[in-house]
Amino acid sequence: MFPHEEKLIRERLGREPNELEWAMLEVMWSEHASYKSSRPWLKLLPTENEHVILGPGEDAGIVKFDDETWVVVGIESHNHPSAVEPYGGAATGVGGIVRDILCMGARPIALLDPIRFGPLEKERNRYLFEYVVKGIADYGNRIGVPTVGGETEFDESLDSYTLVNVACVGIMRPEHLVHSYVTEAGLKLILVGNRTGRDGVHGVTFASEELSENTEEDRSAVQIPDPFTEKLLIEATLEAVYTGRVKALKDLGGGGLTCAASEMAGKKGFGAVIYADRVPLREPGMTPTEVMISESQERMLFAVKPEDVEEIGRIFEEYELEWTVVGETIEEPRFVVYWKGEKVADLPIELLTEVPTIEWELKPYSAEGPVETPDVPFERAFDLVWGSPNILSKRWVWEQYDHEVQGRTVLKPGRDAAVLKINDEYGLAFVADGNPNHSYLNPYQGAMGAVAEVVRNLVSVGAEPLALVDNLNFASPERPEVYWSFAETVRGLADAARAFGLAYVSGNVSFYNEVVDRPIKPTPVVAGLGKVKLEAIPNGGFEEGLLIGVVGLTKPELGGSELFARLGVEGGLAPRVNLEEEKANANGVLEAIRRGLVRAVHDVSRGGLAVALAKMAVAGNTGFTADLSKVPSETTNPIEVAFSESHGRYIVAFPEENLEELKGLFKHFVIIGRTGGSDAVFLWNGWELLRKPVSELKAVHESLPMLLGEEE
């Protein structure tokens, strides 16, 4: 909290707050809880379209899938905790987002985990990577919610740090919707789940400042995961919701009981009384302050009518969950805490829930600049990029996740997007994307590119995009360059979503991601939902005897590319998003899939065309011959054509008889070769640039465990 904020609080209250009141105010006025630095910009984002039932403002967003089914989606970060204690930090990140979905009245059905680390050469980064993955795997597997996709990337700027974002999706029937706020006084507040301990005390305050070198001291701010209680909480909560007697529901995440109760009561102008001494404790001798701001996990707060308390309580007892009435809602908009009969806090509730925004100084920076494309042999360029940890298969990661529990997973990890079966005819596509290298060079274009890539990934599995959520990972907003990059990012996210007719239904902002004065790159992560006809999903890999077509225009855009990163080249221009072309190509590919004209589709993104072709060869265990000189392009340099990361592009493989019909769907569309054989062959004007057996490509592609010191 800043000195001017403390002064404002004293003025509005007309007195000095006591220790408990200061603790609650510090939690609620933290960046993590209040979004005080991001709110002025987030209002630029579009939040409504024909699919949106509920936009931002509650624990998760809701999208209409069909008349019987609504989809609930949210995304969260657990960056600071995971950097300090990777296993517990990542596991509790999963638990928190699952409860966000649950408290809308939905059953969580799938997770995505976009995760980022420093270079794997360093032991500390390998340790963070292995234990973050283990934390996500253990928690998700034990609660029975499959992790079906995500991203795993490595970057110098994250040395000794980690970004752990987790998205979750759930499904519900419309009649089971429960809001996170009350609309009447006199409701009883029931706390259910785990006992309250000292873990996570000051967790949101810890998440609202930079990490120091001595991170071990911060371990007490990391919460302790208990997936077995969470599993019981999921089933008990849904059973309680299905009675129709739950009036409001919130999970206890950041800010603990203070945040959950004040937000639940204050949203519509009511107040709350909390009897903190009734809270079941895990540790003896806890103070009212510790009880009110503890972030112990696996806890939910229910609001029910007094006459329904026993019925709801019986459901919790069936699941052997401890529950207690810890307070009630009141007409007067105040937040009052009692401890053993004594009033120990009494604040106007809006002082907790309506935090003034802060607009920091904005200072543009320029990281872009003209750079000569290095003169590098084609084979060396390909080997560098194909062998990059960012390009390698993440099978080592997702094989630790039970991605098939619940039996809905139609498309498994490794494809452009995951697909989950919702009914016999339709599936839900779910994907997350971001590119910090592009965002660092040009935050506006990088953000637009993240949205465009999400759309391409959804389209590549035949899905019509429905809605988006965003997770914005940045360094300190007090740095003028960082705050400018944040504002530019939000502008890019807004413009791209509007162009596609998409809305953001939920999101998360994580500031202060830096270690010892070293800020991370701007890292917006966008997750998208789409609706797909199950029988129309194309393959992601090649099969024998098909033509290979490239959709879209390739430009000499190597700035922020995987090739430049591997060669250590800085600068260049980030790829520019042409929204009209992006939209037209997406519509064309969707139409081609609907008409059954294409067998396989893959979008072109990180690593460029060469990587996309090689991935399709490995996925289908089938070779190809492709002449890159035929690619629709604004450059005649083979390196630029092969490794540029221009947007708006797809590779399609299809039977020759569909060629004429396909040509009519696109402005830029050219046949560059054929599938077949056991080698991947790249040509330029008929001359061979590179020939690699698909078996060799596959061996390299699956070599991530070797970088971790594990033998296959």
Curated annotation (Swiss-Prot):
Enzymatic reactions: N(2)-formyl-N(1)-(5-phospho-beta-D-ribosyl)glycinamide + L-glutamine + ATP + H2O = 2-formamido-N(1)-(5-O-phospho-beta-D-ribosyl)acetamidine + L-glutamate + ADP + phosphate + H(+)
Top-level class of the enzyme under EC nomenclature: ligase
Positions annotated to bind substrate: S77, H78, N79, H80, R99, Q223, E295, S296, Q297, S510
UniProt KW keywords: ATP-binding, Cytoplasm, Ligase, Magnesium, Metal-binding, Nucleotide-binding, Purine biosynthesis
Primary location: cytoplasm
Pathway: Purine metabolism; IMP biosynthesis via de novo pathway; 5-amino-1-(5-phospho-D-ribosyl)imidazole from N(2)-formyl-N(1)-(5-phospho-D-ribosyl)glycinamide: step 1/2
InterPro entries: PRibForGlyAmidine_synth_PurL (IPR010074), PurL_linker (IPR041609), PurM-like_C_dom (IPR010918), PurM-like_C_sf (IPR036676), PurM-like_N (IPR016188), PurM-like_N_sf (IPR036921)
Subcellular localization(s) per the UniProt record: Cytoplasm
Disulphide bonds in the chain: none
Active-site positions on this chain: H32, H78 (proton acceptor)
GO cellular component, one term: cytoplasm
Binding site for Mg(2+) 2: D100, D251
Pfam family of the protein (one): AIRS_C
Lineage top rank: taxon: Archaea
EC nos: 6.3.5.3
Annotated binding of Mg(2+) 1, by residue: E76, N508
Oligomeric and partner information: Monomer. Part of the FGAM synthase complex composed of 1 PurL, 1 PurQ and 2 PurS subunits.
Function: Part of the phosphoribosylformylglycinamidine synthase complex involved in the purines biosynthetic pathway. Catalyzes the ATP-dependent conversion of formylglycinamide ribonucleotide (FGAR) and glutamine to yield formylglycinamidine ribonucleotide (FGAM) and glutamate. The FGAM synthase complex is composed of three subunits. PurQ produces an ammonia molecule by converting glutamine to glutamate. PurL transfers the ammonia molecule to FGAR to form FGAM in an ATP-dependent manner.
Family: Belongs to the FGAMS family.
Protein name according to UniProt: Phosphoribosylformylglycinamidine synthase subunit PurL
